């Protein structure tokens, strides 16, 4: 065994599970050996029994599988099982023709049992049963499963672009991480591969059914010729012997084939849920007492027709009525959602206390009553999990944990509306319709969709609320399709990023310092208040967040402040030196890699005017300010057409002035100074803002 492992380049200390890699080659060798080598009857019995056991196992796995991809190996198993049955037919045909004249046990006990016991030793009945099984397998199960697999493969392939865009939208919104996005993309690809493989694998099963019919005819004709001409058997005796053996061989192969085909039909017709096929069938067939009562009434009427087997019909009528009564009793025991707690009247008003003072939450959300299931943990509301993912992703990217989102219902809002509050003030609102999907036009969608026209609440893109049945069509037309909870979560994520500096308070500053102290205690020792005050540090970090600069690199921030704070106390000046120290990461944020960067620049004449205005403290002339704003807007549009980041590169002395000036009118514009760009970067001006 050690030599075999070394020859196959396998580890010598194999565990049991490591032998699984040899299952495929061993099965192929077994199939080839059955086709070439003559096998004794006992080995044939073992292989026929193994084939039956394999088919039953495959059917049960298909029944208990909850997702199609949980049994992604099924097309390959279908191929191997088909080859196994055909090789068994070849081996059994060989032994029937060679030793069939010796009696019914020539091909083994399994073939004899199927030929005698299952059809009563009557070859005419056996032929009829065999043909019926082949027709069921070939014309009904296999043909239907193949058609479903073909249509499923077509729809899965057509819907792949939309699914990929939906995954990218969730990733960009922070609803999922990179690992989860990779897993979902892999699932989409595997699903397309699976249905494509099933479309082809179904042809193997249909071919197997045809081969079974041909093999039966060949066995009967060949057996007659061999028995009469070579073994001098009577024609009637030869026909009976070889036909029974052939029927037994055909049945013992076709019954597993029928089971495997049924498993294929179960796999391609199931809907992916958290329940297996049996649970879906039971819960959906037997969950309505009225259906049971009506079915019992029909059976009862049939049972009273003269000449009918009254006992059987009335027995099932009673069983259905009993089942309906039991289901009705279970449903009546479930508490209704309308039950409300009884409020006791207060005879005397209690004195007000400080606990009656309601403090405003840093971040809150109010929802209408139709959106309550989305935020109700007991009703498996998806929005709660998405909000947790948003906060975690934001903390990983920006460097601090945003406040908890306090969610409450508001009956004064429209039923499908929500609004997002920061310190009690509304900063965003929108609508979401559970059970429907928002089809967002990213700019390249084709055609229109029936539904309620609206706008994406996060980015203002044109969108339509559509029914679930139109989801695949919308994805094919190029729309980004997201569910209601994703719409709300994306809007919340956008607002948290937009108001990151406002949500960062002194408490978050202290918590961040405590976190840094755990990792680098020497760095923060005597830093507060020895070097800077907590207020100054908070203001510096807030200034960075206001311009979308991550504060994850607290080591660099603290070291820079420790170096410059003794000589400078102005938070804005300290922010400028910290930005220079963080220049590499700031540039990397907008220009990944180390190559050329495409930026907007300032005309030299305009730069001189701005420097003079800054030094003189006179401010910008109204006309100059308007021209600067208009040209900045045009340059921003050119950057967008080029696919370049909206970055304006200016002199270090002008950066803070222009950033404050452009922030209100062009919040998407990012202003960087020349000192924040490393020497290893090549700068190319795509647009120039001048005074003309």
Swiss-Prot record:
It is a multi-pass membrane protein. Keywords: Bacterial flagellum biogenesis, Bacterial flagellum protein export, Cell inner membrane, Cell membrane, Membrane, Protein transport, Transmembrane, Transmembrane helix, Transport. Its main location: membrane. One of its GO terms (biological process) is bacterial-type flagellum assembly. One of its GO terms (cellular component) is plasma membrane. The chain crosses the membrane at residues 24-44, 46-66, 71-91, 121-141, 209-229, 247-267, 296-316, 446-466. It comes from the Bacteria. The keyword Protein transport applies. InterPro entries: FHIPEP_1 (IPR042194), FHIPEP_3 (IPR042193), FHIPEP_4 (IPR042196), FHIPEP_CS (IPR025505), FlhA (IPR006301), T3SS_FHIPEP (IPR001712). It is found in: Cell inner membrane. Required for formation of the rod structure of the flagellar apparatus. Together with FliI and FliH, may constitute the export apparatus of flagellin. Belongs to the FHIPEP (flagella/HR/invasion proteins export pore) family. This is Flagellar biosynthesis protein FlhA. It comes from Yersinia enterocolitica. The gene is flhA.
């Amino acid at each position: 065994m050690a030599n075999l492992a070394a020859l196959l380049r396998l580890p010598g200390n194999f565990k049991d599970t490591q032998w699984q890699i040899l299952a495929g080659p061993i099965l192929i060798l077994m199939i080839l050996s059955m086709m070439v080598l003559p096998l004794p009857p006992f080995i044939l019995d073992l292989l026929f029994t193994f084939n039956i056991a394999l088919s039953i196992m495959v059917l049960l796995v298909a029944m208990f599988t909850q997702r199609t991809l949980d049994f992604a190996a099924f097309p390959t198993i279908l191929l191997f099982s088909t080859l196994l049955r055909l090789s068994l037919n070849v081996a059994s045909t060989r032994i029937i023709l060679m030793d069939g004249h010796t009696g019914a046990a020539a091909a083994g006990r399994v073939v004899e049992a199927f030929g005698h016991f299952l059809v009563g030793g009557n070859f005419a009945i056996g032929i009829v049963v065999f043909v019926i099984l082949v027709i069921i397998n070939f014309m009904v199960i296999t043909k239907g499963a193949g058609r479903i697999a073909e249509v499923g493969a077509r729809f899965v392939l057509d819907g792949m672009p939309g699914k990929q865009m939906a995954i990218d939208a969730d990733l960009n919104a922070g609803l999922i991480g990179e690992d989860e996005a990779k897993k979902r993309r892999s699932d989409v690809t595997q699903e397309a591969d699976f249905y494509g493989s099933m479309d082809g694998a179904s042809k193997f099963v249909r071919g197997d059914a045809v081969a079974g019919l041909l093999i039966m005819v060949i066995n009967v004709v060949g057996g007659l010729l061999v028995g009469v001409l070579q073994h001098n058997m009577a024609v009637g005796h030869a026909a009976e012997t070889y036909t029974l053996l052939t029927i037994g061989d055909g049945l013992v192969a076709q019954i597993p084939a029928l089971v495997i085909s049924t498993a294929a039909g179960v796999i391609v017709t199931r809907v992916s849920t958290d329940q297996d096929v049996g649970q879906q069938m039971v819960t959906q067939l037997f969950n309505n007492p009225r259906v049971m009562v009506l079915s019992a009434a029909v059976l009862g009427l049939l049972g009273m027709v003269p000449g009918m087997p009254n006992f059987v019909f009335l027995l099932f009528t009673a069983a259905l009525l009993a089942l309906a009564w039991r289901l009705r009793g279970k449903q009546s025991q479930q508490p209704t959602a309308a039950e409300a707690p009884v409020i006791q009247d207060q005879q005397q008003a209690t004195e007000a206390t400080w606990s009656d003072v309601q403090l405003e939450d840093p971040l809150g959300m109010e929802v209408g009553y139709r959106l309550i299931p989305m935020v109700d943990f007991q009703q498996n509301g998806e929005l709660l999990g998405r909000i947790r993912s948003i906060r975690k992703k934001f903390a990983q990217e920006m460097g601090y944990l945003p406040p908890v989102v306090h969610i409450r219902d508001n009956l004064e809002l429209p039923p499908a509306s929500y609004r997002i509050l920061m310190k009690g003030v509304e900063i965003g609102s929108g609508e979401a319709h559970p059970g429907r999907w928002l089809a967002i036009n990213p700019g390249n969608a084709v055609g229109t969709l029936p539904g309620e026209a609206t706008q994406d609440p996060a980015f203002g893109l044109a969108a339509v609320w559509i029914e679930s049945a139109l989801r695949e069509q919308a994805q094919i037309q190029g729309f980004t399709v997201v569910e209601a909870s994703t719409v709300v979560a994306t809007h919340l994520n956008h607002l948290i990023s937009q108001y990151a500096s406002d949500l960062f308070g002194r408490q978050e500053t202290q918590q961040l310092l405590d976190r840094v102290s755990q990792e680098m205690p020497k760095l923060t020792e005597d830093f507060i208040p020895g070097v800077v005050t907590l207020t100054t540090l908070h203001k510096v970090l807030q200034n960075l967040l206001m311009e979308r600069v991550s504060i994850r690199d607290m080591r660099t921030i603290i070291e820079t402040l420790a170096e410059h704070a003794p000589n400078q106390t102005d938070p804005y000046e300290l922010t400028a030196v910290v930005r220079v120290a963080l220049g590499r990461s700031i540039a990397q944020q907008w220009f990944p890699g180390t190559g050329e960067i495409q930026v907007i620049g300032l005309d030299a004449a305009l730069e001189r005017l701005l420097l003079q205005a800054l030094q003189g403290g006179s401010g910008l002339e109204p006309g100059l300010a308007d021209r600067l704003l208009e040209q900045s807007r045009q340059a921003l549009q050119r950057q967008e057409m080029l696919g370049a980041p909206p970055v304006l590169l200016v002199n270090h002395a002008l950066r803070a002035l222009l950033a404050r000036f452009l922030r209100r009118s062009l919040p998407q514009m990012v202003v960087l100074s020349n000192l924040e760009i490393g020497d290893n970067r090549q700068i190319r001006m795509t647009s120039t803002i001048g005074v003309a």
